[in-house]
């Protein structure tokens, strides 16, 4: 039986890997083995960080709300509890956007939370 070398299939597979590895430094964009190893790691990081992005944004929103709340003489936890008692149903993303862009409206929300706590 004659030896089968793979031919076009192997070349296409390697070409695809090398195309995906464009922009990597050193051997990782030139050598197939290094490129395929790095791609595996890159996809692993991408998978992990797609999930991590959600918690990163939540942390950012909480930090922004807390900073704006403390300017209005109330802590983050008391603000959130007060808004819940007052029946204000806003998620952290919306609150952070209001705190960042519209401080007067946020001050009104903080006053609403303070009144609900008393």
UniProtKB/Swiss-Prot annotation:
Described purpose of this protein according to its UniProt entry: Binds directly to 23S ribosomal RNA and is necessary for the in vitro assembly process of the 50S ribosomal subunit. It is not involved in the protein synthesizing functions of that subunit.
Family: Belongs to the bacterial ribosomal protein bL20 family.
UniProt-listed InterPro entries: Ribosomal_bL20, RIBOSOMAL_L20_CS, Ribosomal_protein_bL20_C
Domain of life: Bacteria
Pfam entry (one): Ribosomal_L20
GO biological processes: ribosomal large subunit assembly; translation
Keywords: Ribonucleoprotein, Ribosomal protein, RNA-binding, rRNA-binding
TM region positions: none
Gene Ontology, cellular component aspect: ribonucleoprotein complex; ribosome
One Gene Ontology molecular-function label: rRNA binding
Full protein name: Large ribosomal subunit protein bL20
